[in-house]
A protein has these predicted regions:
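Structural signature of beta-strand start/N-cap positions in the alpha/beta core
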Residues: 1-2, 100, 158
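Active-site neighborhood of HAD-like aspartate-dependent phosphohydrolases
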Residues: 1-40, 56, 96
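Conserved SAM-binding loop
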Residues: 11, 83, 101-104, 137, ...
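Phosphate- and divalent-cation-binding pockets in alpha/beta enzyme and binding domains
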Residues: 21, 49, 86, 111-114, ...
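Substrate-recognition element of Asp-dependent hydrolases with the DxDx(T/V) motif
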Residues: 22, 90-117
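Helix-loop "lid/cap" segments that line or gate small-molecule binding pockets
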Residues: 25-26, 45-59, 115, 149
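Metal-dependent phosphoesterase signature
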Residues: 52-89, 97-99
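Substrate-recognition "cap/lid" segment bordering the active-site pocket of phosphatases
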Residues: 108-162
Length: 163
């Protein structure tokens, strides 16, 4: 059996962390964002998450904005990231029971790596890790799941997705 996990909202709660980093980062570009501004863009990948809010306030999105948000994210993630209770134990038990695990997240690789490190979840538990940077179409499009199954060397029909 093959299980593909999402990261945010499944293994960890990083939304408050990226939100705080985005508010602080966008402020440096003259955007006075509010937490609720980000709600429509949750799960759409960081380019859209940050860019959508910047554009709402009439500021053109630039890649440097995301870079700055990630700088801030990396500074605060160890204090703010919430790991859901039992996450590590469940992942370790599934691995011990012979399940192939993978991670498919719309987040960028830098965020995935930071979250796994802070959560003390070994990347080696996962047969494949696919980020939003690895696909053209974001969720709910199936591309990320198909790519993850392919990277695992498994047929998509043999994979269970936990979102």
């Amino acid at each position: 059996m093959n299980i593909i996990f999402d990261m945010d909202g499944v293994l960890v709660d990083s939304e408050p962390v990226i939100e705080a980093a985005a508010i602080a980062g966008l402020k440096e570009y003259g955007v006075e964002a509010e937490p609720e501004d980000f709600t429509p863009f949750i799960g759409a990948g960081e380019d859209r998450y940050i860019g959508g809010v910047a554009e709402k306030y009439g500021v053109a999105y630039k890649k440097e904005m995301k870079d700055r948000v990630y700088d801030i994210y990396l500074e605060i993630v160890s204090d703010k990231l919430k790991v859901f209770k039992g996450t590590k134990e469940v992942l370790n038990q599934l691995t011990d029971d012979g399940y192939n695990l993978a991670l498919a997240s719309s987040a960028d690789a830098v965020k995935i790596e930071a979250n796994l490190k802070v959560a003390d979840i070994s990347q080696f538990l996962f047969k494949a890790i696919v980020s939003g940077e690895d696909v053209e179409e974001k969720k709910p499009a199936p591309e990320i799941y198909l790519k993850t199954a392919d990277k695992m060397g498994e047929a998509p029909a043999t994979c269970l997705v936990v979102e």
